[in-house]
Amino acid sequence: MGVSKNTDKSFSRRSVLCGIALLAVGLSTERANAATTAVGATQSGNKIKLDLAKNKALAKVGGLVQIDLSDGSSLAIIRTAAGAKGISAINLSCTHQGVPVTKQGSGWMCPAHGSQFSLNGKLIKGPARSALQKYPVSVTGNSVLIG
């Protein structure tokens, strides 16, 4: 009888726990960069109505929610300042080639070619040559009308 080699490729408890920890950190970072989906937004033609009371993320400056439109594009509604004039709406398609931008730090980035935009859509770095498209916004009480 010879000595048999153990070819079992099982993982140690430590390597499993390290893997779980790395996964948790990765998921929490991704969630921190994701915009909250707007609650109760309604689209009628080219107008969108949003209830501020249902979208608590817009209560503080820097807060934002995302609205996915019927045409496949997305908008970000952003609290840029206090008061009724402190709400902005931008299209989340890069102005370079139309690729959806993603939340990156305190702004937006195009994953295709690296264009960078501020939180309110201003162009920071190309190859895009213009800011993200903005939409007119009016606020009456708790109601936001976009478009």
Q: Where is each model-derived feature located?
A:
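N-terminal secretory signal peptides and thylakoid transit peptides that target proteins
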Residues: 2-27
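Short aromatic/basic micro-patch
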Residues: 10, 49, 88, 111, ...
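Short amphipathic alpha-helical/adjacent loop interface patches that line ligand
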Residues: 20, 62, 114
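Hydrophobic membrane-targeting alpha-helices
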Residues: 28-32
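N-terminal pre-ligand scaffold of iron-sulfur
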Residues: 33-95, 99-104, 134-147
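Short cysteine/histidine-rich metal-coordination sites, predominantly Zn2+-binding motifs
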Residues: 108-114, 124-132
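Short, acidic, Ser/Thr-enriched surface-loop or helix-capping motifs
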Residues: 118
